[in-house]
């Protein structure tokens, strides 16, 4: 039906007859000549119909936006005065000789030109129309090229693309599972995989030493801009490779991807330990474009008569940190109050501040509601450590260390944006040496997942003292966004059983949920390691999209619904009966 894509016609085709198909982006009648902008996935081309062919001209005059048409005509160069440098095809146009309406279009339920006026609900309900917008089409085509490049790299490095099951068994991986009832085994359920983690480890045990898969994963969790109930991972696993080798290979892949797709050289990825990242930036995925850093000052404040500072300064689990903002002395009291409310979102009880109005005047040049609690030597040391200059402001976080990190880390990012401090376009790094466990309500939880190997300890040593142990785990971070994370895996049964016990998983529960893994670990399991990248997130970053919804063809809403298909929906009584399921209606409270 066509000889060329609309966006591919150029000056080399001048004088040639072409057959094009696509959608009418815009139609206008100017002085008896009809101009069409015809659109397909590759772009737009201008088609001109004049009255010399009355029948064809009459059809052209009836066209409206989004009619699907076939055009036949001759390519000609535009006069210099009419060249459109904003269009890829702006040097040429097609003189129409024939026109077929393949399918007419009703008036659209949303605007494709002024899409900002469309609600998110409208865009998702009529996604097949929203995807016709060039911006959306370009993102999906970019995504296809990225997956192709990833496959080429992994294929050329000896990785095998192997599929793993979608219907599997529920395992505790941090989020709720999507469950699928079994008709054959009444009362029993499959789970949709949160990741192929255990299957890819089993593939290593099977001798397939380099595996990859671009795979759908499912998590029933609260959604944010970078979360969806179903998402896509670039999943990788290797045998007989150390964490350093895995990082080197996947860094090579990511650097090559950015060079091929964006002509960006990411350079070498620096390494930073988890503890350093949390200390300096209050985050395990720091945005290094932002020059602001947290500075510890608790040692200066243990004796001050101001409990807001001295209490956390004397608490082993407390922290007092200072954040200098260049030029921040210009902040109004209302703006400081807004920052105080902002850190309150993250659990902070307040936000002390110190304005450096004139450093040459000593204490006289410093303004702060807490100045009366601090002697001159303490103030001077705070100024020295933070590097504060005249015109700056120093903001203080004082609380439990976790609260300070989260609240001041978030404030660091906000202030960096507010004061336009970000430097450079791309700043990657590896974050390494994560804690093996974290304590929540007195119980140990895996920081990554229960199959992550500790670094440099035996099973007995780990179980005897699990606190403060370091895992052999690594995250790739770019511009404050975690692109992917992985680890060396546990490859012996003794260590895996010890980790389960530390996590409060009884031997019986471990046997019921992970018996197949524990048994597999008895039969010559090789050392193995891997990681998974979030493909949607990578595409979002590379294209500058504001949400992963804008780089997925048919995403869900933030309430995990699909307005297009009205999913999820109710099952009919016969289906429920076959599955042995009864739906319990939610009780409704009545007055009186």
UniProtKB/Swiss-Prot annotation:
Residue runs in coiled coils: none
Lineage top rank: taxon: Bacteria
PROSITE patterns with a match to the protein in the record: AA_TRNA_LIGASE_II
Chief site of localization: cytoplasm
Catalytic activity: tRNA(Asp) + L-aspartate + ATP = L-aspartyl-tRNA(Asp) + AMP + diphosphate
Binding site for ATP: 219-221, 228, 482, 534-537
Keyword terms, alphabetized: Aminoacyl-tRNA synthetase, ATP-binding, Cytoplasm, Ligase, Nucleotide-binding, Protein biosynthesis
Subcellular localization(s) per the UniProt record: Cytoplasm
GO biological process: aspartyl-tRNA aminoacylation
Record EC number: 6.1.1.12
Any one GO cellular component localisation term in the record: cytoplasm
NCBIfam families (UniProt xref): aspS_bact (TIGR00459), PRK00476.1 (NF001750)
Function text: Catalyzes the attachment of L-aspartate to tRNA(Asp) in a two-step reaction: L-aspartate is first activated by ATP to form Asp-AMP and then transferred to the acceptor end of tRNA(Asp).
Subunit structure comment from the entry: Homodimer.
Stated family: Belongs to the class-II aminoacyl-tRNA synthetase family. Type 1 subfamily.
Protein name: Aspartate--tRNA ligase
Gene encoding the protein: aspS
């Amino acid at each position: 039906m066509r000889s060329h894509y609309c966006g591919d016609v150029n000056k080399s085709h001048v004088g040639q007859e072409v057959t094009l198909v696509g959608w009418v982006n815009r139609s206008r009648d100017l002085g008896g000549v009809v101009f069409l902008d015809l659109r397909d996935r590759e772009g737009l081309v201008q088609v001109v119909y004049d009255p010399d062919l009355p029948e064809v001209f009459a059809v052209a005059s009836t066209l409206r936006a989004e009619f699907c048409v076939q055009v036949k005509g001759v390519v000609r160069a535009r006069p210099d005065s009419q060249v459109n440098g904003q269009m890829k095809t702006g040097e040429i146009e097609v003189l129409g000789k024939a026109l077929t309406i393949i399918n007419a279009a009703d008036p659209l339920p949303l605007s494709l030109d002024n899409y900002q006026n469309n609600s998110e609900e409208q865009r998702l309900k009529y996604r097949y129309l929203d995807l016709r917008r060039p911006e959306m089409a370009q993102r999906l085509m970019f995504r296809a090229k990225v997956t192709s490049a990833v496959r080429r790299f992994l294929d050329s490095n000896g990785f095998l693309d192997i599929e793993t099951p979608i219907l599997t068994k529920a395992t505790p991986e941090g989020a709720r599972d999507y469950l699928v009832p079994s008709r054959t085994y009444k009362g029993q359920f499959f789970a949709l995989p949160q990741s192929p983690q255990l299957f890819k480890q089993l593939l290593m045990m099977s001798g397939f030493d380099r595996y990859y898969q671009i795979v759908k994963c499912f998590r029933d969790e609260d959604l944010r801009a970078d979360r969806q109930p179903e998402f896509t991972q670039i999943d990788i696993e290797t045998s007989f490779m150390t964490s350093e080798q895995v990082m080197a290979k996947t860094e090579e892949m990511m650097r090559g991807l950015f060079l091929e797709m964006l002509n960006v050289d990411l350079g070498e990825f620096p390494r930073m330990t988890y503890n350093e990242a949390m200390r300096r930036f209050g985050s395990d995925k720091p945005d290094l474009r932002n020059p602001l850093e947290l500075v510890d000052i608790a040692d200066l404040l243990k004796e001050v008569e101001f409990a807001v500072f001295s209490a956390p300064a004397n608490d082993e689990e407390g922290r007092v940190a200072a954040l200098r903002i260049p030029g921040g002395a210009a902040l109004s009291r209302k703006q400081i109050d807004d920052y105080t409310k902002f850190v309150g979102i993250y659990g902070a009880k307040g936000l002390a501040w110190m304005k450096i109005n004139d450093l040459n005047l000593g204490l006289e040049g410093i303004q702060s509601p807490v100045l009366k609690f601090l002697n001159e030597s303490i103030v001077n040391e705070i100024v020295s450590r933070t590097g504060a200059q005249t015109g700056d402001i120093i903001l203080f976080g004082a609380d439990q260390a976790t609260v300070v990190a989260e609240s001041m880390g978030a404030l660091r990012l906000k202030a960096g944006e507010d004061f336009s401090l970000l430097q450079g376009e791309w700043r990657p790094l590896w974050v390494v040496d994560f804690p093996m466990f974290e304590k929540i309500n007195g119980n140990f939880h895996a920081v990554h997942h229960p199959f992550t190997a500790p670094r440099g300890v035996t099973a007995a040593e780990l179980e005897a003292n699990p606190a403060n142990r370091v895992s052999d785990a690594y995250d790739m971070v770019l511009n404050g966004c975690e692109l992917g994370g992985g680890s060396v895996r546990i490859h012996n049964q003794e260590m895996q059983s010890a980790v389960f016990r530390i996590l409060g998983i009884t031997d019986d529960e471990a046997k019921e949920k992970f018996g197949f893994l524990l048994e597999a670990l008895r039969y010559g399991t090789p050392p193995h390691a891997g990681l998974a990248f979030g493909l949607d997130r990578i595409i979002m970053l590379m294209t500058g999209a504001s949400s992963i919804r804008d780089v997925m063809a048919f995403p869900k809403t933030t309430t995990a619904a699909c307005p297009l298909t009205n999913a999820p929906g109710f099952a009919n009584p016969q289906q429920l009966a076959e599955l042995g399921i009864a739906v319990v209606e939610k009780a409704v409270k009545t007055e009186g």
